[in-house]
Amino acid sequence: MNKIEYFNKEIEYIKDGNNKEDIKALINILPDYFFEIPASSTGKYHPKFASTNHGLLKHTKVAVRIAHELLANDSIGSKFSDNEKDLIIMALILHDGFKSGDPKEEYTRFDHPLIISKHIMENAKKLKMGTDDMRKLCSMIESHMG
């Protein structure tokens, strides 16, 4: 499975070359189940299209597309630097990365944003981004569940 190919379009939204390389490295640490499972086992928090096989992937791609369109609109996007926009897109690609835990469990782990954040920090030496950007990225992801 070439995990990066699933996100070719979304990676193109990222402007900085180093950020593109970093998101590719981080996509490669996502578990295989991320690309196969529904976004929700109950349908309670996600639309019907995301409750099928590959639903989590679909949910993620839709979230990224909506963010990209919002950030392209000057009324919203002008408030963010290009680097901040890159980090937002990256956070959305990764936000549910370990939704079922590590290793995979039957149900959603409430702390799944903390799990992916931990994996990002553990892979810091493989990334080109600085500590401040890594903290921002992890903070965005960690706040996903409130």
Q: Which functions belong to the PLM regions below?
A:
Residues 57, 82, 107-114, 131, ...:
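Short, amphipathic alpha-helical segments
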Residues 59, 95, 112, 144-145:
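Histidine-centered active-site/metal-ligand motif
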Residues 63-66, 109-127:
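An active-site-proximal "capping" alpha-helix that borders the catalytic cofactor pocket
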Residues 78-79, 88, 128-146:
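Histidine/acidic-rich helix-loop-helix segments that form or flank divalent-metal centers
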